[in-house]
Design a protein with these regions (language model features):
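Phosphate/nucleotide-binding beta-alpha loop and adjacent structural elements of enzyme active sites
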Residues: 1-65, 69, 73-90, 95-356
Length: 356
């Protein structure tokens, strides 16, 4: 089967119109790499967008007014995200003096503010640094006396908007039998915690298998499990793969660690398969977010999936082809699955394939 035929076949298998709109938008992003157009689509598609990076800050500063430092592409994206979330933007700032000439004094309808004026007249406002290389601007702001507590640095210089309840949106907890949850790529344990909340507490699940190979994340996971009082967790400190092995691993500690090669990796890790760990046992729900190893992990879970048809929530954004290759493989494992696709953020990350 050719690639185009496979892409169209997966499109036809998607079970609702939202899934098809997401599929089309992601395909266009893969082909054209137009992040701004994708952002515009996301904002038009979803009306419940929130900005998680600002939520903790706004608990302490409920009337925050924002100034964007950086009028390039990231600043333009940040402006659209803030407005879609209902935030108050009062101006923008940039070190490029040419942007302040004549008609360019206004950016996206907001006034331009000279960098030197921030510390003098705007120290009660909040500056969001909206450039990739944020450290020099942060240092510039601190040196001019701008309060550190009113400076927000977005991850990778890109403010992120999101919506929905990722991994759980399309599923209802089965109250007739207890859930058995597999969290492959549990990072900080928060998804496991969300699962417990979703299913209604420890009376409604039998067991949780949590896989995480990144040693720098183990303490976070265990702390999350302990604070939330999560019981019956089998914490597997290994990566998921199609078999038991030892592989090169590139660790970040930020939820984006991944299998690498000898040249790029900074350590070696043990990996195993879901079928090996469950050893013929049941799973009712499998979540996979394993930074590009989703297909190998599915191959290593094929017996569990064939035998028990668990609910599946699979990340399909780490590799462009995963969106159709993973869907095709899931259909081969169990043709009775109904497939849905959802996207959760204003960037290309966090596209989830659901199989029910």
């Amino acid at each position: 089967m050719g690639k185009l035929e496979l892409i169209n076949r997966v499109y036809d298998k998607l079970c609702d119109e939202e899934s098809k709109r997401v599929y089309e938008a992601k395909l266009e992003l893969i082909i054209n790499n137009d992040e701004m157009k994708f952002l515009d689509w996301f904002i038009s598609e979803y009306k419940d967008i929130r900005c998680p990076e600002l939520e903790a800050y706004e608990k302490k500063n409920p009337n925050a007014e924002y100034i964007l430092f950086g009028a390039g592409k990231e600043g333009q994206k940040a402006y659209k995200i803030l407005k879609s979330c209902g935030k108050k933007v009062i101006g923008w700032c940039d070190n490029n003096k040419n942007l302040y000439d004549g008609k360019n004094q206004i950016f996206q309808g907001e006034p331009g503010i000279l960098p030197n004026d921030l510390g003098l007249h705007y120290s009660d406002k909040t500056v969001i640094i909206s450039v990739k290389n944020s450290l020099p601007i942060y240092q510039q702001l601190v040196l001019m006396g701008f309060p550190r507590e009113h400076i927000i640095i977005s991850m990778n210089g890109s403010l992120l908007g999101s919506h929905g309840n990722q991994y759980f949106d399309l599923f209802s907890a089965d109250k007739t039998e207890k859930e058995i949850f597999v969290d492959a790529g549990c990072w900080d344990g928060v998804t496991t915690k969300t699962f417990v909340e979703w299913c209604g507490g420890d009376k409604h699940y039998d067991k949780i298998y949590a896989f995480e190979p990144d040693e720098s994340c183990w303490e976070k996971c265990e702390e999350t499990f302990s604070k939330a009082g999560i019981s019956n967790v089998c914490f597997v400190k290994k990566g998921t793969w199609n078999e038991k092995d030892t592989l090169y691993f590139k660790t970040s500690g930020r939820g984006s660690s991944s299998i690498g090669n000898k040249e790029t990796a900074n350590l070696r890790i043990q990996v195993t398969s879901i079928d090996e760990v469950l050893n013929g046992g049941k799973a009712t729900f499998i979540k996979l977010d394993v930074e590009g190893s989703e297909m190998e992990t599915l191959i290593g879970a094929q017996e569990t999936i064939r035998n028990y048809k668990p609910k599946l929530a699979i990340s399909v954004y780490h590799k462009p082809e995963d969106m159709w290759m993973v869907a095709e493989y899931v259909m081969k494992l169990n043709p009775d699955y109904k497939l849905y696709l959802r996207h959760y953020t204003t960037c290309s990350y966090e596209t989830i394939l659901y199989a029910i």
